[in-house]
Regions:
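Duplex nucleic acid-engaging cores and interfaces of nucleic-acid transaction enzymes
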Residues: 2, 21, 96, 122, ...
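Short conserved micro-motifs on helix faces and helix-strand junctions that flank
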Residues: 61-68, 73, 125, 180, ...
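Short beta-strand-to-loop capping motifs
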Residues: 79, 125, 311-315
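Conserved polymerase palm-domain catalytic core
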Residues: 105, 149-150, 155, 162-322
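Generic alpha-helical secondary structure
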Residues: 22, 52, 83, 87, ...
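Amphipathic alpha-helical blocks
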Residues: 65, 77-103
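Non-catalytic, polymerase-adjacent accessory regions of viral genome-replication enzymes
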Residues: 1-84
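Reverse-transcriptase-like RNA-dependent polymerase core
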Residues: 56-59, 91-117, 126, 130-138, ...
């Protein structure tokens, strides 16, 4: 997708949030999460009129919304309905059944890759995509407040260009020339569902009804190209709107563990101070880093984009120990 289109989508999303009055809600969720508050009652926000209408607008701006799932419907079919009907149907799908939310089977499609292989893509039904978008909009600011600054994939106001810029900074300015490269093979297909739910809980997302909905999203049946149906016991569905956010939740512990070895080490944090560079205020930890280099601690920095990450070290010894 061209950069111009990507920027346009981001700006459209912001304008939509302002239009439906959700921007202040998102800011409040971020601030509360940053201060360590818990969130036991999020479903009311997720199923609010403004959040549902915002989700519709955000999905409609994506051309993929016109691709049908197993129910053969797309965003155009929802667009023909009055807003009140859409809102009521979303609420009914999520809470109206005695068995709880049950997403329809996800359509599996194999997408060709440049190397001749294929990548599996899941296409949820459009109503389930709308519900995932409603959930994502509320979860994202809560999770963003807890995510590491060194993660760049599938996050608002961050991109692969930011990851590349950080990489060049570590190589050329910090002179960290020993680099370990990692790519977690089959990561999205092997996410442990139970562990993911525990990680969401530890981030403060403690609405049990919401966690039940997320479990159902993860375990949605998959309709294979040959017509058979599979029932996943692990993994996040590639193609699901909420999947990239959940993947970042899973890898957030890795980010913070590596940060704790150097960037967020107590010695660095205790000697940090604020200073102005040009017009921006930054936190300078250089004094702490100087003291830490006199110890046996490993100097290491991570740059992660989804399941692909690099660890940068000062010397070969630290790289081998890492």
């Amino acid at each position: 997708m061209p950069k111009e289109r990507k920027k346009s989508l981001c700006m459209d999303t912001l304008r939509h949030a302002e239009y439906y009055g959700m921007l202040q809600t998102f800011d409040d969720l971020y601030a509360k999460s940053k201060s360590g508050e818990k969130f036991p009652n999020l479903m009311e926000l997720i199923l609010s009129q403004d959040n549902i209408m915002l989700a519709y607008r955000n999905i409609k701006s994506n051309t993929g919304s016109y691709t049908a799932g197993t129910d053969h419907q797309n965003i155009g079919d929802i667009g023909k309905l009055p807003p009140s009907v859409v809102i009521e149907k979303v609420r009914k799908i999520v809470t109206g059944s005695q068995h709880g939310y049950r997403p329809k089977p996800v359509r599996r499609k194999d997408i060709p890759k440049p190397n001749g292989k294929t990548r599996p893509l899941g296409i949820p039904c459009i109503w389930d995509r709308l519900i995932q978008q409603c959930v994502k909009q509320i979860l994202e600011p809560i999770c963003e407040a807890k995510f590491s600054n060194n993660s760049y994939g599938f996050r608002p106001n961050r991109s692969v260009e930011h990851a590349i810029s950080r990489t060049y900074s570590l190589l050329q300015r910090a002179h960290l020339h020993y680099v370990l490269e990692f790519d977690i093979k089959g990561f999205f297909d092997n996410v442990n569902h139970s562990k993911l739910i525990r990680q969401l809980w530890s981030l403060g997302i403690q609405d049990k009804q919401l966690l039940f909905v997320i479990k159902r999203i993860l375990k949605a049946p998959i309709r294979m190209p040959d017509g058979t149906t599979e029932y996943p016991t692990k993994g996040t569905p590639q193609g699901g709107i909420i999947s990239p956010l959940l993947a970042n939740v899973v890898l957030n512990e890795l980010d913070h563990w590596i940060d704790s070895q150097w960037v967020e080490h107590p010695l660095a944090v205790s000697h940090a101070y604020r200073r102005i560079i040009r017009t921006s205020e930054v936190i300078d930890k250089s004094k702490g880093y100087v003291m830490m280099r006199r110890t046996g601690l490993k100097e290491m920095f991570i740059v992660r984009y989804a399941d692909d990450f690099r660890i940068f070290c000062r010397n070969r010894e630290d790289a081998e120990r890492t």
